Amino acid sequence: MAYVLTETAAGYALLKASDKKIYKSSSLVQDLKSSENVLKQFKVAAFSKFASAANALEEANSVIEGKVSSQLEKLLAEAKSDKKSTLVVSETKLANAINKLGLNFNVVCDAVTLDIYRAVKEYLPELLPGMTDGDLSKMSLGLAHSIGRHKLKFSADKVDVMIIQAIALLDDLDKELNTYAMRCKEWYGWHFPELAKIVTDSVAFARIILTMGVRSNAAETDMSEILPEEIEERVKSAAEVSMGTEITQVDLDNIKSLAEQIVEFAAYREQLSNYLSSRMKAIAPNLTQLVGELVGARLIAHAGSLVSLAKAPASTIQILGAEKALFRALKTKHDTPKYGLLYHASLVGQATGKNKGKIARVLAAKAAVSLRYDALAEDRDDSGDIGLEARAKVESRLSQLEGRDLRTTPKVSRDAKKIEISEARAYNADADAATAPADSTPADSDDEEEEEKKVKKDKKDKKRKREEDAEEEDSKKSKKEKKEKKEKKEKKEKKEKKEKKEKKEKKEKKEKK
């Protein structure tokens, strides 16, 4: 006996096939080409209706995840017989789950079953009594929307997609701002070349162009809102003796248009940076406290989502962003990179030399814990206490490695060590003597002689040890060479013996003939 389990938007349908070995048929596609053949081949053995739309969503998710719900288990238990029957299922995970139940079914799910399901789905309204094509389409559409909403799990506070887009836009804005600022300095530099050396800030440079216009207006222009007083004086004095060429009003208008773009871009960049900061504090407060908004946002963007990053181990977080260097190192059998995007974290930046790698490893481990709390904790608060605690521990480790106090995170204050004040010595007049007795030898000279002897002895010991090591290496090499020579000699002798034997055998054969 063969059954086909069909999941519809209305409920579970268990179809009984008239041919027991339908899934083994060689002409299956031809047999199920028309509605008459399908209706003749399959009949509804049992149907379990969904109670509501919520129930339909729950059952559909169970099938997608490869789980057997209580409703489906009940349907299969009622349909099972004493003889072992074949059950055709569409999902491999679901087939494995049904097998584990221990029901009297031989569960089948392979490429052939797809043809059966294609035919059943096409003529499903005709197979199910009291079900029209329109009703089934409406139910399927409603269920599809419900599954889509369930998968998205939309929440205004936990949309990491916004972070990914914001950090990508922020990087693009930085590139555009740098390009525009460089072009503006080069363009206006023909008229007032000294200004770029005095005012290095791009936004301030653009605002001066908008306020001042041509350099001849510098003396009458008030720049106190843009520049400090001493720099303003330098700009005005440089404008009087500038080596730049004169420009027309049309040129100035175009330069001003570019300067306006720079000012607007800078204002929008600041607004976007504040938005990203607030989003990061809402979505990943602990990660933000530990590595900062920008590094945290780049990690999330690189991983694809907060949950994907939270699932990653600390070793992956440590080298995230250095994939090219990692695979190049593995290919060439060199040392693998110690850090990726975490290199830009302030804590790694405070470390020096070889300590950077150690701090990156510690920071990655703490970031993994903070991320899992941010992404997966049910009763999470947005205070970022776990991130602060983790940062304090990383700072403590950094201070220990660097040998100086680098802690910035507030910590429980310990009792200050008491300072002991010792009495000053009385003045010793005898110590002012110009000369000391000739026969009295100072104790310091004896100590120095002993130290010199000790240093010489250490040097001799080291030299002797080096010589012994060199001799040992030479002896090892000579032994190895002797062994290799012996092996070569033995191989040569064996080869010669073999050749002699073969010649002898050939000679004997010839004589016999």
Curated annotation (Swiss-Prot):
Chain intervals with Basic residues compositional bias: 456-465, 477-513
Composition-biased stretches (Low complexity): 429-443
Any single Pfam family the record assigns to this protein: Nop
Entry's Gene Ontology molecular function annotations: snoRNA binding; snRNA binding
Family membership: Belongs to the NOP5/NOP56 family.
Physiological role: Required for pre-18S rRNA processing. May bind microtubules.
Protein name: Nucleolar protein 58
Species classification: Eukaryota, Fungi, Dikarya, Ascomycota, Saccharomycotina
